[in-house]
Structure formats: structure tokens, C-alpha cells
Swiss-Prot record:
Belongs to the ABC transporter superfamily. Keywords: ATP-binding, Cell inner membrane, Cell membrane, Membrane, Nucleotide-binding, Sugar transport, Translocase, Transport. ATP binds at residues 36-43. This is Sulfoquinovosyl glycerol transport ATP-binding protein SmoE. PANTHER family: MALTODEXTRIN IMPORT ATP-BINDING PROTEIN MSMX, OSMOPROTECTIVE COMPOUNDS UPTAKE ATP-BINDING PROTEIN GGTA. The gene is smoE.
């Protein structure tokens, strides 16, 4: 196991700067997930750690070694890819043990490592099969087993679940988390899926346009987003946003609705009077009007019953918002509805910078 340090890490292709001076410390044994939209630099950063991509500037340190100039085989890392990268003509056992064979590990020692990893992943019965005889989920487990037998200091996962269907993604995601609990090895994991990030990570690194937008635990990035981007990216359905103005002790929306400032966390900040802000409210922080002192009068647009709850889409001024409501609440489209809000859960962001007002 080892810590990983990224210092002023930079990557450019000609005049195009992809990764913009990232600073990040990953602790020994930590599970860190890089998440963000396509083109944000997450996979490029991972590939620089792996040695598969040259570094334009800055430093990558694994343990106590600066590895900028080291080839991948000398970095003591193991990588799991999206497309499995298995040899089709080799058995599962041969695929899992190939790197050990190249390193000159004895057959008995290699087989012991393979058997241990296969048992951990529940694929002992597949060891004599070839990749063409396996399902997608089984192939991904083999790819993970191939990484495990190397006993690296750091595991690198590059969108390993993208080729799997929703059910398999959930199963393999659980196995990856259990694997980390058993091995305790440092993991850097790249995904575009915020659900994977929230369920797997000790800490999440949210990237945007080659910069780090926020680093924090799943709880921190969900409940204390530092920007509109983070608030809207993390959570499903996404955080709702609407523009408002601070008028005295009220947060006033353009359609005449308002909320009390006293219960909103940033209200103790000075200089908010008359200020335009972006209001962020998560769907689950709405509720039936009778359960809340603070209420909004809204017009229902669309209703989506989900069994366990109901998603109610409505307009608030010029904004379209979504509320997660109890399953028994079934308003009709175009109905005028009073909806409750928990003001202590309301987030305020600067209308210009879109950064959180703490």
C-alpha cells in the first residue's frame, strides 16, 4: 500500500490544456474516486499516474518515489480497464497469472495467488474457461483478479463498470467495495457516474474542465456543495436551482413566493441584503405542505409515480424544479399546489460566481 501525491500536475496537447495544475494528496489505503463529465480530465489524470500518459508539468509521487520518468511496470500499480483487456485464447487462470509468469514467479506460488483471488471474487469455477465463455460481469471479475494477484501498492480503475448493464453494475460495485475492505489497498477510481462515486468513495474528487471543483467525503459533497456545478452534478434527481433576491428577512422569488432567511444556514453572512442569489434545494427537502412552516405556491407540470415515492415537477418563477414526495401524493398536471420546504436545507450560491455562500 502507498500514498499518492499529485503536485501541480499538468497536461497539454499543444495549446490545449487538459489538466490544469492539480494538487491532491491521497492517503495510504484510501479509496478515492475521480468523477466528472466527459472531457474534464479524470481519465487523463489517471493515465498520468499509471505512466500511460506523459506529464507536461508537475509531479506524481507514489509512496516516497517520484515516478514521472518511470515506466508503468516499475510503478507498482495494477490497472482495471473498461474493456477488460483479456487474452481470448488463454483460460481465466492463464489470464490472471500472466503478469506473474512474466515476472518469473514460480508456478506453485502463482497458482496459490490465483486461487486466493478467485475465491475472493467467487470465480473459482471459471478458472478453466476462456473469456468467450464468460458473461460481461464475469470478465470484469477476471480483470479484477488479474490486478489482485499482482499485489500492487495502488489499484487504478478506469470506468470498469461502463460496459455492464444496470443490475451487473450494482453487483460488481458491491464486490469492488468489499474487495477494498478486505485488501485495504489504495484505490484511484475513475467514473462519470455519480452513484458509483457516492457509494464507493472514502473521498470524491469532482473535476470540471481540467480543474478540481471540490474534494470531500460523499456526505460533504452532497450536503455542502461548494458550487452550483457540484450541487447539480451530485444527486439523482439533481439539486434544484432558482434565482432569488434577499429582501430584508425574506428570500424572494420572481413569482411572489418567498422563504424566511432566518433558518437558512448562510443567513448569518453580512452584506446579503438586496443581493441576487441562486437558491439550491434538493428534491427530498420538499414535502407535503402540512408538515412545514415554510411553503411555496407552485404550478404542477408533470407527475412521475415511482412506487416508493412520487416525483412532482413544477415551476417556480422561470425555473423548473422537482420534488420527491410521498407515494400517496398524486397531484394532477396544471394543479396549483402548496408545497413545503425545509429552509435549513436550502443552499445559497452567488449569482455571478456560482460559488457557495457559506
Amino acid at each position: 500500500m502507498a500514498s499518492v501525491s499529485l503536485r501541480k500536475l499538468d497536461k497539454s496537447y499543444g495549446a490545449l490544456r487538459i489538466v490544469k495544475g492539480i494538487d491532491l494528496e491521497i492517503n495510504d489505503g484510501e479509496f478515492v474516486v475521480f468523477v466528472g463529465p466527459s472531457g474534464c480530465g479524470k481519465s487523463t489524470t489517471l493515465r498520468m499516474v499509471a505512466g500511460l500518459e506523459s506529464i507536461t508539468g508537475g509531479e506524481v509521487k507514489i509512496g516516497d518515489r517520484v515516478v514521472n520518468q518511470l515506466p508503468p511496470r516499475e510503478r507498482d500499480i495494477a490497472m482495471v480497464f473498461q474493456d477488460y483487456a483479456l487474452y481470448p485464447h488463454k483460460t481465466v487462470r492463464e489470464n490472471m497469472g500472466f503478469s506473474l509468469k512474466v515476472r518469473g514467479v514460480s508456478a506453485s506460488q502463482a497458482n496459490a495467488s490465483i486461487d486466493e483471488a478467485a475465491k475472493m471474487l467467487g470465480i473459482e469455477h471459471l478458472l478453466d474457461r476462456r473469456p468467450g465463455q464468460l458473461s460481461g460481469g464475469q470478465r470484469q471479475r477476471v480483470a479484477m483478479g488479474r490486478a489482485i494477484v499482482r499485489r500492487p501498492q495502488v489499484f487504478l480503475f478506469d470506468e470498469p463498470l461502463s460496459n455492464l448493464d444496470a443490475k451487473l453494475r450494482g453487483q460488481v460495485r458491491t464486490e469492488i467495495k468489499r474487495l477494498h475492505q478486505q485488501l485495504g489497498t489504495t484505490i484511484i477510481y475513475v467514473t462519470h457516474d455519480q452513484v458509483e462515486a457516492m457509494t464507493l468513495a472514502d473521498r470524491i474528487v469532482i473535476l470540471r474542465g481540467g480543474d478540481i471543483e471540490q474534494v470531500g467525503t460523499p456526505d460533504e459533497v452532497y450536503n455542502r456543495p461548494e458550487s452550483v456545478f457540484v450541487g447539480g452534478f451530485v444527486g439523482a434527481p439533481a439539486m434544484n436551482f432558482a434565482r432569488a433576491r434577499v429582501n430584508g428577512d425574506r428570500l424572494a422569488f420572481s413569482d411572489g413566493n418567498s422563504l424566511p432567511m432566518a433558518a437558512i444556514r448562510p443567513s448569518r453572512e453580512t452584506g446579503l441584503e438586496g443581493r441576487d442569489v441562486i437558491v439550491g434545494i434538493r428534491p427530498e427537502h420538499f414535502g407535503p405542505a402540512e408538515g412545514f412552516d415554510s411553503q411555496l405556491a407552485v404550478s404542477v407540470q408533470v407527475v412521475e409515480p415511482l412506487g416508493s415515492d412520487t416525483l412532482v415537477h413544477f415551476s417556480l418563477g422561470d425555473a423548473a424544479l422537482t420534488a420527491r414526495m410521498p407515494p400517496q401524493l398524486r397531484p394532477t398536471p396544471n394543479e396549483e399546489l402548496r408545497i413545503g420546504v425545509d429552509p435549513s436545507k436550502v443552499h445559497l450560491f452567488d449569482a455571478t460566481t456560482e460559488r457557495s455562500i457559506h
